[in-house]
Amino acid sequence: MLDCIVIGAGQAGLAVGYYLRKKGLDFVILDAESGPGAAWRHTWPSLTLFSNSASSNLPGWPMPHHEGFPPASHVIDYFARYEQRYELPIRRPVKVDKVDHDGACFHVFAGTEQLTARTVVAATGTWSAPFIPYY
């Protein structure tokens, strides 16, 4: 049984993974995407962060400098390097179908696979069904 299963490898999931790793806990991060970058993999080309790189850090390691507001490609690269730097145990692509709790532990179902853990963190974000405006 794992200490924790984190569902989602975006900003929140990576930050949780950092602290779980720091505490030496046994965990896995399940991510539905085929690679790093979370929702940034699906944005329109002109989308940027609304803050500069110095204000967009994940715990433990600052985002590399970028003049102005970083574009999606910069964020995706940062996420990928962050995952590698902290050797986060991310499995992709894994789509979680269901999470149950039996009173003692959580059961996470993904396709034909079932994992168990003492805790689950839902870090799926809000971009599972993004609204992209039409102009």
Model segments located where?
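Conserved Rossmann-like nucleotide-cofactor binding loop
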Residues: 12, 35, 127
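FAD-binding core/adjacent interface of flavoenzyme oxidoreductases
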Residues: 1-2, 85-135
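Glycine-rich active-site loop/strand segments that organize a redox cofactor
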Residues: 38-77
